Amino acid sequence: MIVYSELSLKGKKAKDAAYKLGSLSSQVKNKALEAMAYALVAQEEEILAANALDMEAGRQKGMSKALLDRLMLNKKRIEEMAEGLYALVSLPDPIGEVKRQWRRPNGLEIGQVRVPLGVVGIIYEARPNVTVDAAGLCLKTGNAVILRGGSEAIRSNMAIVKAISKASEEAGIPEGAIQLVEDSSREVAQQMMTMNEYLDVLIPRGGAGLIQAVVKNATVPVIETGVGNCHIYVDADADLEMAEKIIINAKCQRPGVCNAAESLLVHQDVARKFIPHIGKVLTEMNVELRGCPRTLSLFSGIKEATDEDYATEFLDLILAVKIVDSFDEALEHIRKYSTGHSEAIVTRDYSRAREFTRRVDAAAVYVNASTRFTDGFQFGMGAEIGISTQKLHARGPMGLNELTTIKYVCYGDGQIR
């Protein structure tokens, strides 16, 4: 196990790197991002070989198909990670942006300027793409990053960080700007949670257990990237063909991600027509349905849903289904079980759609669209560092701006108070 002194050394290197990063030009940072993207593709074979070992170990451990999908890399996914870095190059550099500026009666000029957070710590699970996204976003915003990924992806992460850190340093980025903690034990994660001397913020990405452990135990400031117990509500006035497409996309495209749908609510006025149809379609797509008693009466052969099912982020091809008597009952169900991530309504009633967006308390609320769009790249932010479900500092997909803070820069000509 890594000892605290080794982790502290990484922290010191990151702190030193952050000091230098904060004053680098956009040109240097963009050049480094391009070099990192090129290195990912150039070292694809080494990265895929490392990932193959992680995948085999995951199968031996009995990881679910959804979790293995999160872990898996292939040529296309590596190219997508590289494209994410290239996309960051084309985005404006937020560092140095003057958010607002004003002049006081005494002539003092005050400006509110974006600056880096400093050193960002990321604790995450078996998703190698997070390694690239986090490194790229932090570099673009002048932040150093210390990455602690899950043991399931350790070989993949080591290969990725070896490629991108070397490429970035050769392009002018200071050593220590991108570091990986290779010990993925819980003890090391606990140590990171108390590294206030070195870390300016800690961002957990993963399941409920990991996130709650960090929120509960960290003394470092935390931005909580929440669990995604996302709902789709099919209203009485819904276009049912549209609803079918949205549900299939939200549940089946990538069930192991936080913006996938976990619960389906259907208004009783359309349930008799819609439930048997959507039940058949989803069952044929290998989705395990768990329904309320009324759902079971319309589509037999499925499990009865429990309260725990309605509260669960399955991250798998499982969907909890409930028939509701009214729009208000749907909202109450969402209020009770939502994790505040992403919620959707399918309806042709504009006033009801507006009411849904006002009353549902979530980071992203959708009208006639899939919850799968809650994603930094899909929102046009480039990659994302995570999806925040808290309300302080950042909420929703966290792109470049969310990795900055502000500094007040004041110009005078001898003013005293």
From Swiss-Prot:
Enzyme class: oxidoreductase
Position of the signal peptide: none
Lineage: superkingdom: Bacteria
Keyword Amino-acid biosynthesis carried by entry: yes
Subcellular location: Cytoplasm
InterPro entries documented for this protein: Ald_DH/histidinol_DH (IPR016161), Ald_DH_C (IPR016163), Ald_DH_N (IPR016162), Aldehyde_DH_dom (IPR015590), G-glutamylP_reductase_CS (IPR020593), Glu-5-SA_DH (IPR012134), GPR_dom (IPR000965)
Annotated Gene Ontology cellular component terms: cytoplasm
One GO molecular-function entry: glutamate-5-semialdehyde dehydrogenase activity
PANTHER family: DELTA-1-PYRROLINE-5-CARBOXYLATE SYNTHASE, GLUTAMATE SEMIALDEHYDE DEHYDROGENASE
Protein's name according to its UniProt entry: Gamma-glutamyl phosphate reductase
Native source species: Heliobacterium modesticaldum (strain ATCC 51547 / Ice1)
